[in-house]
Amino acid sequence: FPNGGVRNTFEARGYSAWDPSSPVFVVDDTLCIPTVFIAYTGESLDYKAPLLKAIQAVTKSALDVMHYFDPSVKKIISYLGWEQEYFLVDEGLYAARPDLLLTGRTLMGHEASKNQQLEDHYFGAIPPRVAAFMKDLEIQALELGIPVKTRHNEVAPNQFELAPIYEECNLAVDHNMLIMSL
C-alpha cells in the first residue's frame, strides 16, 4: 500500500531487547521473556526502559554520595517493597454493578457513615472464604516466582492486602505487574 513515507509500512523501527535482570517465566504453556521496547532513535516505547534508566540514575547518584564515606564502594542495589491492595466483591454483587462490569473499577458510591469505626475489620480475623482466596492467589504467585510474604485485612470493608519480600527494583516492578494480572 502506498503511504507516501520514506520506509515500508511493515518497518516499525522499534526494537525489543531481552531484559536479563528479570527472569523468564511460564504462564500456562507460554514462555514469557521480560523485554524493553525502544525506538531506533533510543526513545522509550514502553514503561520498562524508563524504569531501567531511572534505576541507573539512582545508582550513579547513590555511588557518588557513598564515595564521600567509602571510596571502595563499587555497586549500589536499589530494593523495593510494594504492597498490593485489593477489594473482593462477590460475583453476584459484581454483576449488579454496571460501573464494575464496564470499567473494572468503582465509579459510583457514597461517603462512609459519620464516625464509622472500622478497627473491627482492620484488626479482625480474615474470613475463611477470603483466606481460601488468598491461599490460591499466593500459590499462583509462587508458581510465577513471586515470593509473597504477608497478607492481612485493610481498613475498608472487603479490602485486603498482600506484600512480597523486598526485591531489586526492576524485579519488584515486574512481579507487581504480574500479581495485578492474576
Can you say where each PLM-predicted feature lies in the sequence?
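Glycine-rich, acidic/polar active-site loops that bind/position phosphate-bearing ligands
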Residues: 1-182
